[in-house]
UniProtKB/Swiss-Prot annotation:
Protein family: Belongs to the TRAFAC class TrmE-Era-EngA-EngB-Septin-like GTPase superfamily. EngB GTPase family.
Matching Pfam families: MMR_HSR1
Organism, as annotated: Pyrococcus abyssi (strain GE5 / Orsay)
Top-level taxon of the source organism: Archaea
Protein name: Probable GTP-binding protein EngB
Length: 211
């Protein structure tokens, strides 16, 4: 009975109304998937961004409500940059996350919900592990709680189909899909509050495990 009421309480609680001690939240994703726009929607603070892929090329830290937001450079294709430079940036992202894994409370992997299925299938046809899939697995191997923000909700015709496709490729159990994938529109703000609540929920779970 107690468990039932606790779950009911969790369903209606707004985690953003409850203060938290400083948490570190890392945003990662391919270039030009909307990370900086999403961070602006969440925090009200602008990060340098643009239409050319790869505008954010340095690690950017933002203080927000006593928390630390880390905007990682986009990985993958970056306009005007040689392949070796792109690989070096990816390596820097990997090393930073590996070195700071114990300090990271939650990672938000932002994917382009409209383009991701086609990109993933293209990589698989080449016999390669899609970079979005590889990065999700990398975060999980480091035991960093990860939520996937499926961006550009406003451009997706069948959201459920895309989410289930990603869940299969990311090897996420069916009973964890709703907690792992949050379809959003960073451009229009759709479901951003839901994502924020999920981030806070993960932080609380993380803090409980550390106590």
């Amino acid at each position: 009975m107690i468990s039932f009421f606790f779950k009911l309480f969790q369903k209606f609680i707004n985690y953003t109304d409850i203060p938290l001690l400083m948490a570190t939240i890392v945003f990662v994703g391919r270039s030009n998937v909307g990370k900086s726009t999403l961070i602006y929607r969440l925090t009200g603070k602008r990060v340098r961004r643009g239409k050319r892929p790869g505008v954010t090329r340095k690690i950017i830290e933002i203080e927000w409500k006593n928390h630390k937001i880390i905007d990682m450079p986009g990985f993958g294709f970056m306009a005007g940059l040689p392949k070796e430079v792109q690989e070096r940036i990816k390596d820097e992202i990997v090393h930073f996350i590996e070195d700071n894994a114990s300090k990271i409370d939650v990672a938000v992997l932002v994917v382009d919900g409209k383009a991701a299925p086609e990109i993933i299938e293209r990589w698989e046809k080449r016999g390669e592990i899609p970079i979005d899939v590889e990065f999700y697995q990398f975060l999980r191997e480091l035991n960093i709680p990860t939520v996937v923000a499926v961006n550009k909700l406003d451009k997706i015709k069948n959201v459920q189909r895309v989410v289930h496709f990603l869940a299969e490729k990311f090897e996420v159990p069916w009973d964890e899909i709703d907690k792992t994938f949050i379809p959003i529109s960073a451009k229009f703000g759709d479901n951003v509050e839901k994502l924020k609540n999920r981030i806070y929920e993960i932080i609380r779970e993380r803090r409980g495990q550390r106590e």
